[in-house]
Every structure is written in C-alpha cells, then in structure tokens.
Amino acid sequence: MYKIVRKKELNAAVTYMEIEAPFVARKAKAGQFIIFRVDEKSERVPLTIAGYDREKGTVAIIFQKVGLSTEMLGSLNEGDYIQDFVGPLGKPTDVEGKKRVCVVGGGVGCAIAYPSAKAFKEAGVETDVIVGFRNKDIVILEDEFKQACDHLYLMTDDGSYGEHGFVTVKLQQLLESGIQYDEVLAIGPIPMMKFVSKTTEPFGVKTVVSLNPIMVDGTGMCGGCRVTVGGEVKFACVDGPDFDGHKVDYDELMSRNSVYREREAEERKTHICRNQKMGEELIK
C-alpha cells in the first residue's frame, strides 16, 4: 500500500498528488512513468512522473479526472492509501549532448513537460518552454516553469492570459527568428504533438514526442501500448514513451486511444452519481 502524503487541486479537473514510494523515488528520472491501481478491483492506469524527492521518498503525479480510476483516485485525500504504485517504467528523457532545446507542453501534458524542462535546465541546457491552455482558468505550474527554464512563453487559445494563439504559433515564430534548437520536445494532446512535429519538420529540427497510449502491464507483454513509428511497431512502455515525432503514425494512435473514451466517461459518471446518491441517503 502507498500513502498519499500531499494533495492539491491545480484546477477544477486536474489534481496534484505526492505518493510515498521510496523505491520508485530512488530510481525515477524525468520522462518515466508509473502504473497505479486504487484498489484490488481497479484497472491499471499509467501516469507520467511529474516529480520526485529522493530524500523524502515521494513521487509526484498530476492527473485529470477523465474516467472511473482517475475519479476514484481524485476522491482520496492525504493520509489515504492506494493499492499499487509500480515504477519507474519506460526510458527517461535524454538530456545529454544538447546546447539549446524547446519544450512544448499542452494542457495537462504540461505536468509531464515540467520535469523534462527542469532536467534539461539542471543539465546546463539552455531551455525554452512553450505551454498552452484553452483559457486562463486551467493554467497550471506557471511559477514552477519559470524556475525550470530560461524563457517561458505562455499561450491561451482565447487570449485570456499570456499570448493569444496555439503553441505552434509561438514555435513557428521562434524557429523563423533563427534560433537553432538541438531538439524540440512536445508533450500533450496527440493533435498538438502532431502539429508541433509538422511545424518543426521544414526546419529540420529533431522533434521528440512523449506518448501515452492504452497500456496494461507496462512491460511490453500485453501489446496494448503498441504504436507505429517509421513503419515499425514499437511498444511505448519499453521502447518509449519518447519517440521521433516526425515518424509517429498519429492517425492510428488517435484511433486506438479513443476506443474506450466513451466508456471511461460513462463509468466516471456512474461513479459520481452513485456517490451522490449514497451521500443523500446518509443525510436522510
């Protein structure tokens, strides 16, 4: 069992948690992920590590409540326990041998972009960060990003905060200004990563995307996390989660990732309704 030692709501749908997991914290690196189960009957859900403290033995996760398991996890509080917390899994983000990079994060994907940006900065790499959100109300980790990079560009789709436009607008501007990036790392919704890769391709800039496909065991045995990269089948849990953004088959990835979306939403809705009904019964 793994204890929740800290919980913070970052916005209405996104939650930050620190889990007491000393063995995971000891080995964790930016870009890797864990798999959790809330209880014995729960599904196994992968989440990218959002931070870690080796001295305290804690691992941070940031998640959006989209299905039953994340809704159940979000209903727990500090001092509660979860059944499983396995990791670190996957290959860490490669921060070596680079002079300047640009990390691009979208929405809740910024939770994953943050530790990678921090790792680049700590490795002595000049780090630009572009983060994008739909509006001001869902902006997360702004102060943390300011400490983890050399230049931060915050974009909102509606212009309610930061600069108006998508992350690709700012990326295009930076590339056209003549900045020479050794790498662009994109983390977020699949369409965003796809268009970031399309933006960088004419400039010949190496682009890496962090993928989070459907996953079950996290060891490559189930095949659920398979993705097509450069015409070859790869497994995100062992070959990734970072891949060459110019070679990923995004259309296939989007199709596979959407298979259970409606069911996840329905399960979450049922769970919320059940809890509300139980609360009403207790009040009576």
Label each region the model flagged:
Residues E71-I214:
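FNR/FR-type flavoprotein reductase catalytic core
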Residues I112, I190-P191, N212-D242, H271-N275:
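Local cysteine-cluster metal-coordination motifs and their immediate loop/turn environment
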Residues R6, G51, L154-T156, V209, ...:
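Structural signal for conserved beta-strand scaffold positions within catalytic alpha/beta enzyme cores
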Residues S42-G51, L89-K99, C237:
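Short, Lys/Arg- and Gly-enriched loop/turn segments at beta-strand edges
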Residues M1-E78:
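Ferredoxin-reductase
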Residues F235-D239, F243-K284:
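Short Fe-S-cluster ligation motifs
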Residues F36, D84-F85, V227:
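A generic structural signal for residues embedded in beta-strands
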